[in-house]
Amino acid sequence: MGIFLGLVDSSSPKSSTSCSLMTSCAVEKCLNKDMVRKIVIESSREEVFGNLVEKFDMVCIAAKCGNECSQCKHCHYALEQMSALAQGEKTSGLCPKLETCVFNCLTEDVSKVLSCVATRCNVHCYDGDCPSCKMISRRIFSTICKQHSMTSQPQIKYEGTCPNLFMELADHYVAKKKL
């Protein structure tokens, strides 16, 4: 996942619809369908979550789905945070660990910021530091899960729903990253 930051907000119907449009746009325009299919089919249950979410790219979403993103409060905050961080300005601090980590990646080596964020900062999207980031990611993951019948893939074999699979795999991802 590229830079992913977000705002916690109660979901109004307008926000929910707007976030659905953002999710559809992100899946369609910012993820390579063949790559996603390959990840879903070939990754083990333990690897599928990280292999997918580390491909989620907030920079792409901002560029290719900017209108949809700005209408979804969770995503709009992410755009504001990305802009502030890129300009070296203070953020509102709603996702302190994630924002600090992204800022450190930007200051260490701007040419490697996306890989730095993916390997070092993504965990903060799922560890409770940034609930809105987790919500955006859950929407994208769940859409992919449904499109590719992920729960019935032989290596995944999950009896529940895609959002519940996301929550279970997110917890496992955090536990593994914190080892």
UniProtKB/Swiss-Prot annotation:
Primary site of residence: membrane
InterPro entries named among the record's database cross-references: DUF5332 (IPR035161)
UniProt function note: Acts downstream of daf-16/foxo to suppress tumors induced by disruption of gld-1. Potentially a direct target of daf-15/foxo.
Compartments reported by the entry: Membrane
Cellular-component GO terms for this entry: membrane
Annotated protein name in UniProt: Protein dct-5
Pfam families listed in its UniProt record: DUF5332
